[in-house]
UniProtKB/Swiss-Prot annotation:
GO MF entries: transmembrane transporter activity
InterPro entries given in the database record: MFS, MFS_trans_sf
Lineage: Eukaryota, Fungi, Dikarya, Ascomycota, Saccharomycotina
One GO-annotated biological process of the protein: transmembrane transport
Name of the featured protein: Uncharacterized membrane protein YJL163C
Subcellular location: Membrane
Domain of life from the UniProt record: Eukaryota
Extracellular-facing ranges: 1-83, 147-188, 251-257, 378-386, 450-459, 513-523
Keyword Zinc listed: no
Source organism of the structure: Saccharomyces cerevisiae (strain ATCC 204508 / S288c) (Baker's yeast)
Amino acid sequence: MSNEDETTRLMSSDEMDYLLETAGINALEEIISQNDSTGINLDTNETAQDSSYDSIRRSPSILSVAKSVEGEHGRRKLLCLYGLVMIICIAESISMTATIPLVMDKVAEGISDENGHYDSVAVQTIVSSISSSTMMIAGAISIFMAGKWGELSDRIGRVRVFKYMSGIRVIGLLTHVFTLSSKMKYHKWAIVLTACIVPSFGGLFALVANGNSYVSDIVKTEHRMVTIGIMMSCIYATMGVGPMFGSFLVKWTHGNGFIPIYTSIAFVILALIICETIMVEPRHETQMAHSQSTYTKRREKLRSQSGSDDARNYQSVTYGKFQIMRLMDLLAPVKKLWLKPDSAGSLVPRHTVILLIVLDILFVCGTTSCMPALILFSTYEYKWHAVELGYFISILGIGRGVVLLVVSPTLLYTLKRIYQHLNHSIDKIDIFCIQFSMIVITLSLFVMIRFGEKTPTSMIIFALLQALSAFCSPTLQSGIIKYTSKKHTGEMFGAMALVRSCVMLVIPPILLKLYGSTVSVNPSLFMYIPFSTSIVAILLTFFLRIYKNPPLDGP
C-alpha cells in the first residue's frame, strides 16, 4: 500500500467536523471570489511544508469538485457513494431515539412485581448500567476493528466491505429487536451484547473510514479534502434528519417504538441491494492483489520470526507476536504528538500541541461524552420518549451542520480580515474560536445545572449553545497539524482520533455510572464534571502561545 493510500485510510470519523468546515470554507470563498473582483490572493511562494489549514484556503471549491473526478463514470461513483452513506446513516439515526424507550420498557417489565409495579429509579440505574457496558465493550472492539476494516478493504475492495457492514447492521438490528420484543424474557446482558454488534463491527467510525478510502481511489489528491467534506455534510444532514423522521414514525403509529427499527432494517437492506447492483468497485484488481500479497508476506514474516519447533507453541507465539505488533502499530501515531525541539531548541511547539490535545479532551468531555447520561436524564426528569428525543437530537445535529457550513466559514473569513493568519503556528483567530467555543459549552452546561430540573426548555437552549461550539473541533485539529509537515498529516489525525476514542471509552461510562448512582438523590449531579472540565478548558486557553519562529520541518 502506498503512503498516500495509508494516509487516507488513517482518516477517521473524528475528522468529521474539520472536513465539513473545510467544505463550508471553500464554498464561501468561491462565492466571494465570484462577487469580489479582488478575491482572495494566493501566495505562490508557499512551501511544501505549509499547514493543512492553509491548504484549505488554496484548495478548490465545492462547485469545482465535479471537475476533479475524471469522466462521467467517476462522478456517478461519487453520487452512488453519497447516496449509500446517506441511506446507512439515516438507518442508524432513525432507530437511535426509539431504542432507548424500548430498553427502558424491557427493563421495567423485567423488574416489575406481580401487579406490574416497578421502581422508576431502579429502571434508570439499570439502563445506565446497560448503556455504559455497551459503550465500553463496543468502544474497545471498534478501536481495533476500524484498522482491520481498512486493511480488509485494501485486500478485497471497498464495495465488499460496505456489503459486510450492511449485513452486520441487519444482523445486529434483528437480534437487538428480538431481545427487546415480548417473545424473549428480560436479560440484561442479552441486551448489552446485541446492542454492541453494530457499533463494534460496522459502526460510523468504520463507515466513514471506508468512505474516505473509496474517495481516495477516484478523486485527485488536491480535491480529496473538499470531496470528503461533502460526504461529511451528507452524514450530518441525514444524522440530523433521521431522529426527527423516527419521531414522526413513532407518533404516526401511536407510540410503536419498533416501527423505526423495522424501517432502519429496510433501509439497510436497500443499502445491500445498492452495493450489489449499482455500486462499482473503484479499487483495481492489481491493487487488491498487491495488498493481499503484502498481507501474506507480513504474516509469513511473523511465522518465520517465531523460532519455535513445537507446532502448538509455534502457533501461539506467532499469534501473540502478531497481536502485539498490531497493538504497537495502532499506538505508533501517538508518538507524533510528542514533537521534537525545533532547530533553536525551543519546546514551545511541543507544549502547545500537548495543550491543544488536553483542550480537545476537555472539549469532548463537555460535549459528546455527557450526551448518553443527559438523554437518560431527560427520560427521567421530563418523561421524554422517542418523539421528544428525536426532536432534541435533530436540533443538535442540524444546528452543528448549519454552524459548520454557514456560521463558521463566515466567522473565519471575518476574523482573517482582522487578525493575521499563521501557517506554522496557532494564531489569534484559533485562540478566539477555541475560547468562544469553551465559553458557550460552559454556558450550556450551566443552563442545565441551573434550570435542568425545572423546565425542558433548558434542553433546547443547551442544544443551541452546544451547536455554536461545533467549530472548536476543527480549530483544534487544524491548530495541531500546523506543527507538522503534510506527509505526517494522516498520522497526526490518526493519533488525535485514537486519543478521542480512548476518552469516549472512559468518560461516558463514568458519567453514566455516576448518574445511575445519584439519580434518586440529585439527577443532575453528573453535569458538574463536564461543567468543571469546561471551566478548566477556558483557563487553559490563556496559556496558548503563538510560535513566532519560522515554520517547522515537521516532527
